[in-house]
């Protein structure tokens, strides 16, 4: 298809985006620039997701109205994305009138066709504020880690998912009053009624999605779709246009995806206004030309893995259920997580480098783009570290690509007076000169073909690395040819090499332009050409009168190059003396940046958190010190192998259990509820997050290893007694997978012990340990063998051995 409708996941406006949040926008920008350079009619939209409880609560904390807060953060997001050179055709908001109209219209279509139902449920209610409390309006003490500021849906200190009724000392965040639970009625999207039609559509399109998206969506479908609430008792949101529900708003998951449509509509209206005309019908026709009754539009969406089901399942079901012929998802690129210095980014805790930090760091935006795209987490989680940032920038970007440009063009400027040599090696009568020239051209041709295929498949990281492989090949040709030595004796060979390298540089800059728009445009000027990744002439899309740095006009009219110009060998005549565009990152500077933007300490679970967040609100220093001493008594020093072994043998009970039954969690789509025979005579229930990784049938009958004496906890309303042990690996397709630790030869109840200990059957009811104590003893996979403190784990005299995981950590 030659029409590309490209979206990046709508960022939520409750804080500044961090580097991990920027991955989707950067990825979509690279693909949009590539599409424009290929001549595709392209529309690239994004915007801020502004409704919901997070905006309401954050606004209340800052003494602002939700509208004021959203306006502030919308402008902040817009400025950050502009600094990162994201070439949106339009960047909008979900608080527009168009968004409300389209969301309500979509709801009315669903309701009229019988896909909306009503149900009653219990919800926390504040008597003082006289309102129901959504998750973020209710806080209390986490029953697991005793963090006194846990939200009703999740504790950010220990990461455990919670239910409102499990909070200890629950209170309204606005007034501090303890809530009561009252019945309330809500509207639901009847997904079961849409499942047949959805499955039919899913089977025809998912081959163009990333593996993680397919796997996660299949996990939702295995046990059948469930009805999902679409309304909330809030004020800040799209009002529900239905009698009896006028005081409610739509759940943000329902209205946010409609933002892609409403932002496109706002963009076309803005473009029409700037063009000085256009009737209402013309405006409608423009946005409809992208979203309604179009067979030639390919919808390509970029999201993080936490947003997968909203784009692959819920939004498509909404569109299918409306009965209208909407443009449906064609290709989905879902990335894994980008972590920070061994920990996690956190908007609310302020952990990691944020967009505003990058902007203020003095480091050019293309250096950030380079690293984030070079390490794009396509198939597994990636990690940002300052050390590797420095290494990659200095060695690959500056030492490889920039070095090729500067060395080659400086030599031509000085030695040839800035005139590109006329000697075409492909026409030489000398075999050596011809072969060297044709070898470089073949390298360019092969790289361009591989990159084009990879870019069309949205495998951006591998495509980007092809640029540096070609650059390294050209650097080697320059070094081997050594024209500064050979030119006096072999002028023809030196001239042919330098001419060809000038064209190779032009090719490299074209191929790298979607990734590094500022650098490649500036470097292209040294060759007297310019690059373009803006909308094609007359394309329109939803282009406002936008003028990026990469599209700025030079002093004189110059040839504009596109993707199809790679491999062409005409048009270069002059070389301007190059200037240094990037300086290497110095070790001292990087150390200062790391200290400046870290400001973190390690909590007991190994999660990086700000020092100011280490002491949960409500615990004084004496209580915190006492808790720390208790943890120190329970957790052995990790460097003490003997004590690790002793602690494991005395405190940690791992034993075999047979999986009897597997069901989907009634309140959590990504969780299984397993019933197991653990040899005690009483069935055990464990909740696990294995839905995205394996089918229920793969679990049934398995003899798995469980943590027998782990402190029970409630996960979304189901009490979980223990934990299944598993390890991560990357499968043959390069995607993350999970392998369970199993002992098929063993009986239920048989305990796993260190090789030096005798096998035993553990009595039911051993002393419980918490998660921190369990994870303080690393269980590792070393050459397929499961070990603790360097000693093999055994069951029934046989070692535990993984089938797929060669090296890794068990948890």
From Swiss-Prot:
Its EC number is 6.1.1.10. InterPro entries: aa-tRNA-synth_I_CS, Anticodon_Met, Met-tRNA_ligase_1, Met-tRNA_synth, Methionyl/Leucyl_tRNA_Synth, MetRS_core, MetRS_Zn, NA-bd_OB-fold. The keyword Transcription regulation does not apply. Its main location: cytoplasm. Zn(2+) binds at residues 142, 145, 155, 158. PANTHER family: METHIONINE--TRNA LIGASE (PTHR45765), METHIONINE--TRNA LIGASE, CYTOPLASMIC (PTHR45765:SF1). This is Methionine--tRNA ligase. It comes from Treponema pallidum (strain Nichols).
């Amino acid at each position: 298809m030659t029409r590309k409708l490209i979206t990046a996941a709508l960022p939520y406006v409750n804080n500044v985006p961090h580097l991990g949040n920027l991955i989707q926008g950067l990825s979509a920008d690279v693909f949009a620039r590539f599409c424009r350079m290929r001549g595709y009619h392209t529309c690239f939209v994004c915007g801020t997701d502004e409704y919901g409880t997070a905006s309401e609560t954050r606004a209340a904390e800052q003494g602002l109205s939700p509208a004021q807060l959203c306006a502030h953060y919308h402008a902040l997001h817009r400025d950050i994305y502009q600094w990162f050179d994201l070439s949106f055709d339009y960047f909008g908001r979900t608080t527009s009138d168009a968004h409300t109209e389209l969301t309500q219209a979509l709801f009315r279509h669903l309701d009229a066709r019988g896909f909306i139902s009503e149900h009653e449920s219990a919800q926390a209610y504040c008597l003082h504020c006289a309102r129901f409390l959504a998750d973020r309006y209710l806080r209390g003490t986490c029953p697991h880690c005793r963090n006194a500021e846990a939200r009703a849906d999740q504790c950010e200190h220990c990461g455990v998912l919670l239910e409102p009724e499990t909070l200890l000392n629950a209170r309204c965040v606005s007034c501090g009053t303890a809530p009561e639970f009252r019945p309330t009625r809500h509207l639901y999207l009847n997904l079961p009624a849409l499942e047949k039609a959805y499955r039919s559509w899913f089977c025809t399109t998912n081959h163009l999605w990333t593996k993680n998206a397919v796997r996660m969506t299949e996990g939702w479908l295995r046990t059948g779709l469930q009805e999902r609430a679409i309304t909330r008792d809030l004020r800040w949101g799209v009002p529900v246009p239905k009698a009896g529900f006028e005081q409610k708003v739509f759940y943000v998951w329902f209205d946010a995806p409609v933002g892609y449509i409403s932002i496109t509509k706002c963009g076309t209206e803005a473009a029409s206004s700037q063009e000085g005309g256009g009737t209402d019908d013309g405006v409608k026709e423009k946005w409809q030309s992208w979203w309604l009754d179009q067979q030639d539009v390919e919808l390509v969406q970029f999201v993080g893995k936490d947003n997968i089901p909203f784009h692959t399942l819920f939004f498509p079901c909404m569109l299918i259920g409306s009965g209208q012929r909407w443009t449906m998802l064609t290709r989905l690129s879902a990335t894994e997580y980008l972590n920070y210095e061994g920990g996690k980014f956190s908007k609310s805790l302020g952990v990691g480098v944020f967009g505003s930090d990058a902007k203020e760091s003095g480091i050019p935006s293309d250096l950030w783009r380079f690293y984030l795209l070079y390490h794009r987490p396509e198939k597994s989680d990636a990690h940002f570290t300052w050390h590797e940032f420095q290494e990659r920038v200095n060695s690959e970007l500056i030492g490889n690509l920039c070095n090729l440009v500067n060395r080659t063009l400086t030599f031509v400027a000085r030695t040839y007076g800035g005139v590109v040599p006329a000697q075409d090696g492909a026409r030489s009568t000398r075999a050596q000169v011809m072969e060297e020239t044709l070898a470089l051209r073949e390298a360019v041709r092969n790289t361009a073909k591989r990159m084009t295929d990879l870019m069309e498949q949205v495998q951006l990281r591998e495509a980007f690395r092809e640029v540096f492989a070609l650059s390294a090949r050209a650097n080697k040709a320059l070094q081997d040819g050594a024209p500064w030595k050979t030119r006096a004796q072999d002028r023809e060979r030196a001239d042919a090499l330098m001419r060809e390298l000038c064209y190779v540089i032009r090719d490299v800059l074209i191929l790298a332009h979607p990734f590094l728009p500022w650098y490649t445009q500036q470097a292209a000027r040294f060759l007297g050409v310019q690059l373009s990744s803006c909308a094609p002439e007359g394309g329109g899309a939803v282009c406002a009168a936008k003028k990026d740095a990469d599209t700025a006009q030079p002093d004189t009219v110059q040839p504009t190059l596109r993707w199809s110009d790679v491999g062409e060998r005409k048009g270069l005549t002059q070389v301007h003396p190059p200037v240094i565009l990037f300086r290497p990152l110095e070790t001292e500077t990087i150390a200062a940046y790391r200290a400046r933007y870290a400001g973190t300490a390690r909590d007991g679970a190994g999660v990086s958190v700000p020092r100011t967040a280490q002491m949960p609100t409500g615990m004084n220093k004496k209580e915190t010190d006492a808790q720390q001493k208790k943890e120190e008594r329970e957790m052995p020093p990790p460097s003490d192998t003997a004590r690790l072994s002793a602690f494991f043998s005395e405190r940690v009970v791992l034993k075999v259990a047979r999986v009897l039954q597997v069901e989907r969690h009634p309140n959590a789509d990504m969780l299984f509820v397993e019933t197991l025979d653990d040899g005690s005579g009483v069935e055990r229930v464990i909740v696990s997050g294995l839905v995205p990784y394996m089918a229920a049938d793969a679990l049934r009958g398995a003899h798995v290893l469980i943590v027998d004496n782990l402190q029970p906890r409630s996960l979304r309303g189901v009490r979980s007694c223990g934990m299944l042990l598993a390890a991560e690996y990357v499968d043959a397709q390069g995607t993350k997978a999970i392998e369970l630790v199993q002992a098929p030869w063993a009986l239920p109840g048989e305990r796993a012990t260190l090789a030096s200990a005798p096998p035993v059957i553990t009595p039911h009811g051993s002393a419980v340990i918490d998660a921190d104590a369990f994870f303080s003893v690393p269980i590792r996979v070393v050459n397929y063998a499961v070990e603790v403190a360097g000693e093999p784990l055994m069951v029934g005299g046989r070692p535990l051995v993984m089938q797929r995981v060669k090296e890794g950590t068990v948890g």
